[in-house]
Design a protein with these regions (language model features):
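Conserved active-site and SAM-binding loop architecture
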Residues: 1-218
């Protein structure tokens, strides 16, 4: 199979398909960090949405469409008003346009002529602005002791079957009372920039990557 991994600089999923003998290519505006530039297209993925591929698996940026993005869409003093009557957030006046552009990008990926399509994103605005996901999964369903709620919108590929259900992993608690999965808290402690934190949040666990490669390429 010829598989396009959209918005994947890490090449975790790309390499999982390559191990099974498939012609998989990652594509991202960033250079790859997975060690195989010969399998990486550093370019705008929308230039490659054509019938040369058998499947596209996309990991679009969630900055403007994750659940946490909702708080920045409107002025905090306008919560009592209907959404369409609320003013833009004073700190982020362009957030609504950013959200709309992000959703349009997802739709462009989903509606491509590629026969099989999978879109991965966290719980967020796609569910309300588009449609509910076909499946919600966790790393602990595929052998990785960690929690990271992940939604899948599928056109062609079947729902993934759990491969190895394990513990849900530890959590790190903070003085504020909030907590993060330990894998995420530990990784955040090592990062210095916003860009590094974004890459950490987009982490694909190996069990999930292997499940996609093994089950969707049959």
């Amino acid at each position: 199979m010829r598989i396009l991994l959209a918005c994947e600089e890490s090449q975790v999923v790309c390499k999982a398909f390559r191990k099974l003998g498939h012609k998989a290519y990652s594509c991202d505006l960033l250079p790859c960090s997975g060690g195989h530039p010969e399998w990486h297209i550093q370019d705008d993925v929308t230039l490659y949405l054509d019938s040369r591929w058998d499947m596209i698996i996309a990991f679009p940026p969630c900055t403007f469409i994750a659940g946490s993005a909702v708080q920045w869409l409107s002025h905090p003093e306008d919560k009592h008003l209907p959404f369409e009557d609320r003013r833009p957030h004073p700190k982020y006046p362009n957030r609504r346009q950013d959200m709309e552009d992000s959703i349009k990008f997802v739709m462009q990926l989903y509606n491509s002529p590629i026969p099989m399509v999978a879109i991965e994103n966290p719980v967020g605005l796609l569910s309300s602005q588009w449609r509910k996901p076909d499946q919600i999964i966790q790393p602990w369903m595929f052998g990785d002791e960690a929690t990271k709620t992940t939604c899948l919108w599928l056109k062609g590929p079947p729902n993934l079957e759990p491969t190895n259900i394990v513990g849900k992993g530890e959590r790190t608690f903070f003085k504020s009372g909030k907590s993060h999965p330990k894998w995420y808290a530990d990784a955040l402690a090592k990062t210095k920039t916003k860009a590094e934190r974004q890459l950490i949040r987009s982490k694909t666990f190996p069990g999930f990557a292997n499940a996609m490669a093994e089950q969707w390429s049959k």
